[in-house]
């Protein structure tokens, strides 16, 4: 198992400086992580720095609330890809899901999938705000809308991934769709537990600590 290729090396804090982003990029190149996950303002800088490597630039869409309109999310997606993003992580319309407005949730996801035009799309459910029934429904809608992955969390709400949620998501989507655990992986043991539960990608700021077999401080 190539653990490094499970990791989306992440820095989404609004106060992140160019120096910190550059450090993230250099670490990702050293460890050959799957991607770095950075805010859209850093796409072009990151894409330039990562030229010649296998590390992709992953960008959040409708982040962190998921409450933008579908048109805005679609524009963000096209803009991100045009600027060099190789993957996008969109946040669902959580309020619509809570309201059982499933058509809107599905249309919202589909708008991003269509705008991505083949670029990998991960759908953030924000599991800490959902019941198990809502988590299952969100997974089904993401799958129906043609997304590539379902993802637990933004890291900006009340909690991150749990092993139980990852297992539920994997059980719901079956073997062929990706599942990303984000927030909560602070050590090698954490990462392994998520992978054993069914995760195929892990979003974390602790990628280096995980690879070194250490435990990182912080909460994402």
Curated annotation (Swiss-Prot):
Pathway: Carbohydrate degradation; 2-deoxy-D-ribose 1-phosphate degradation; D-glyceraldehyde 3-phosphate and acetaldehyde from 2-deoxy-alpha-D-ribose 1-phosphate: step 2/2. Keywords: Cytoplasm, Lyase, Schiff base. InterPro entries: Aldolase_TIM (IPR013785), DeoC (IPR011343), DeoC/FbaB/LacD_aldolase (IPR002915), DeoC_typeI (IPR028581). Its EC number is 4.1.2.4. One of its GO terms (biological process) is deoxyribonucleotide catabolic process. It catalyses: 2-deoxy-D-ribose 5-phosphate = D-glyceraldehyde 3-phosphate + acetaldehyde. The keyword Cell cycle does not apply. One of its GO terms (molecular function) is deoxyribose-phosphate aldolase activity. It comes from the Bacteria. The keyword Isomerase does not apply. It is found in: Cytoplasm. GO terms for cellular component: cytoplasm. Gene3D superfamilies: Aldolase class I. SUPFAM superfamilies: Aldolase. The active site is at residues 89, 151, 180. HAMAP family: DeoC_type1. Belongs to the DeoC/FbaB aldolase family. DeoC type 1 subfamily. Catalyzes a reversible aldol reaction between acetaldehyde and D-glyceraldehyde 3-phosphate to generate 2-deoxy-D-ribose 5-phosphate. PANTHER family: DEOXYRIBOSE-PHOSPHATE ALDOLASE. This is Deoxyribose-phosphate aldolase.
């Amino acid at each position: 198992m190539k653990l490094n290729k499970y990791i989306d090396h992440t820095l989404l804090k609004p106060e992140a400086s160019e120096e910190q982003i550059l450090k993230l990029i250099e670490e990702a190149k050293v460890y050959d992580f799957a991607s770095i996950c950075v805010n859209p303002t850093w796409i072009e800088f990151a894409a330039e720095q990562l030229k010649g490597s296998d590390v992709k630039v992953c960008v959040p869409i409708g982040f962190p609330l998921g409450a933008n309109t579908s048109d805005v999310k679609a524009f963000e997606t096209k803009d991100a890809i045009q600027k060099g993003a190789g993957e996008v992580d969109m946040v669902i319309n959580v309020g619509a899901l809570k309201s059982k407005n499933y058509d809107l949730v599905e249309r919202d996801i589909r708008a991003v999938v269509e705008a991505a035009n083949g670029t990998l799309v991960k759908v953030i459910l924000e599991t800490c705000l959902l019941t198990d029934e809502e988590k299952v429904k969100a997974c089904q809608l993401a799958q129906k809308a043609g997304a590539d992955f379902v993802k637990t969390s933004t890291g900006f709400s009340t909690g991150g991934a749990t092993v139980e949620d990852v297992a539920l998501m994997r059980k719901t989507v079956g073997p062929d769709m990706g599942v990303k655990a984000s927030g909560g992986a602070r050590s090698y043991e954490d990462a392994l537990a998520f992978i054993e539960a069914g995760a195929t990608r892990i979003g974390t700021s602790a990628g280096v600590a995980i690879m070194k077999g250490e435990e990182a401080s912080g909460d994402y």
